[in-house]
């Protein structure tokens, strides 16, 4: 039996989400239609509202409902520090630590030549203009520690250093509460190389 085209379209739309395969998308679609029509309508309205009202901040490129986001407008922040992250979700995680009080630039991705993502796609020119405004003194590269994140950090670091900016990278090592026997060898090696005096 062929499913209705409206249901097929819903399944395909849900499959576009990261980590959602065909079976999960189908289960979600059937659940929404069978058991939670109100939730489905609320989800649809929320998605529509978000797509109509969210835009990119003119300064840092994160999501905002205004031209400039609250972080960029916050005069209590250190305007000489610029932290570069891959996604708005990464920015939120850093904010939750309450340890960083500078400004941000959100790349909305990372370099991945095999996927056709180059400097243009991660808004590299905008980042360089922002970092070269004469106020920024240090750029903190907080890209993820994946191969693509490392390549992105290396590329950005080389380019920004050539413009006379101080560039730092997030430290990495054993997670808080982590036991060495459960931590991978690469992480332990990095923690050993980046050790500090006490």
UniProtKB/Swiss-Prot annotation:
A zinc finger (C4-type) spans 57-72. Coiled coil: none annotated. Pfam families: RecR_C, RecR_HhH, RecR_ZnF, Toprim_4. One of its GO terms (biological process) is DNA repair. Residues 80-175 form the Toprim domain. One of its GO terms (molecular function) is zinc ion binding. Keywords: DNA damage, DNA recombination, DNA repair, Metal-binding, Zinc, Zinc-finger. SMART domains: TOPRIM (SM00493). InterPro entries: DNA_Rcmb_RecR, Rcmb_RecR, Rcmb_RecR_Znf, TOPRIM_dom, TOPRIM_RecR. Belongs to the RecR family. May play a role in DNA repair. It seems to be involved in an RecBC-independent recombinational process of DNA repair. It may act with RecF and RecO. This is Recombination protein RecR. The lineage of its organism: Bacteria, Pseudomonadati, Pseudomonadota, Betaproteobacteria, Burkholderiales.
């Amino acid at each position: 039996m062929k499913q209705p085209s409206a249901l097929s379209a819903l399944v395909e739309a849900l499959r576009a989400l990261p980590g959602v395969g065909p079976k999960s998308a189908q289960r979600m679609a059937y659940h929404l239609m069978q058991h939670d029509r109100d939730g489905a309508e609320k989800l649809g309205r929320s998605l529509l509202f978000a797509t109509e009202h969210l835009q990119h901040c003119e300064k840092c490129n994160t999501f905002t409902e205004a031209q400039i986001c609250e972080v960029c407008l916050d005069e209590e922040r250190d305007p000489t520090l610029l932290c570069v992250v891959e996604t708005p979700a990464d920015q939120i995680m850093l904010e939750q630590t309450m340890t960083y009080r500078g400004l941000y630039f959100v790349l909305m991705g990372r370099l991945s030549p095999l996927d056709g993502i180059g400097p243009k796609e991660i808004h590299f020119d905008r980042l360089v203009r922002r970092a070269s405004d004469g106020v920024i003194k240090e750029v903190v590269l907080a890209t993820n520690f994946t191969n693509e994140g490392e390549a992105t950090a290396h590329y950005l670091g080389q380019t920004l250093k050539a413009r006379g900016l101080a560039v730092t990278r997030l430290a990495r090592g054993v997670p808080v509460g982590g036991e060495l026997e459960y931590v991978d060898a690469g992480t332990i090696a990095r923690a050993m190389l980046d050790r500090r005096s006490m």
